[in-house]
Amino acid sequence: MAETKTFKVFRFNPQTDKKHRFDTFKVPCRPGMTVLQALNYVQENLDGSLAYRSSCREGICGSCAMHINGKYRLACETQISHLSASITIRPMAHMDIIRDLVVDMTPFFEKLKAIKPYLIPGDPDEGAERIQTQDERAYLDYIVDCILCGACYASCAVNGYDDEYLGPAALAKTNRFLMDSRDKADEQRLALVCDEHGVFRCHTLFNCQTVCPKNVDPTANIANLKRQIIARQLNPGFSKKGI
């Protein structure tokens, strides 16, 4: 027999509502059921107007990040059996609400765009391969898994009061390309994150590290950016391979 759990879901439509509310739904939950499957049940059987994002259902696309029982998580990976009998779901913070659990992620992606999230390889000989050794690639293994879900951005306290702060995802992505042996734009990249809304705005609270579903550890990436900047100030001839 399926266990019934109570879901308290944030609801708000800025076009019609003056303030938000929480709607309560009773959902029969079977073993192995995820929060995303519960939301699907609500939408298909109880309230078809409920709005939320989802796509892959396998923790790959990052679409279904939301605030579940006090923590930012991927709904498709969160097992209901690991949660309490009453489950509260809210949208991600620091972004405008489009409707219910759907937020406008434009600021998140604009900040990502600002740090030039692509290789800038310099000018190799025409037709030459940009060779990367296994060790050089292995260094990036823990960084490249970011799925741009926005959980780190929503959990970041600095993003809550500084709208211009680049945020953990953009800064971690900066480190990903800075430490790529094929990239030749070190000074350009560091200059992009070295202003008052950049890397030194981070207070090292580890919120982003705690919520990252892919263990990218934005905090460690940001710390490396700080080291890289300071090392260059102390030693203009410094090479990033030194750290």
Regions from the PLM with identified roles:
Residues 33-48, 87-243:
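Ferredoxin-type iron-sulfur electron-transfer modules in oxidoreductases and energy-metabolism complexes
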Residues 57-59:
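Beta-rich nucleic-acid/ligand-interaction surfaces
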Residues 53-54, 63-67:
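DNA-contacting interfaces and partner/effector-binding or oligomerization modules
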Residues 3-24:
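Eukaryote-biased recognition of intrinsically disordered, low-complexity regulatory segments
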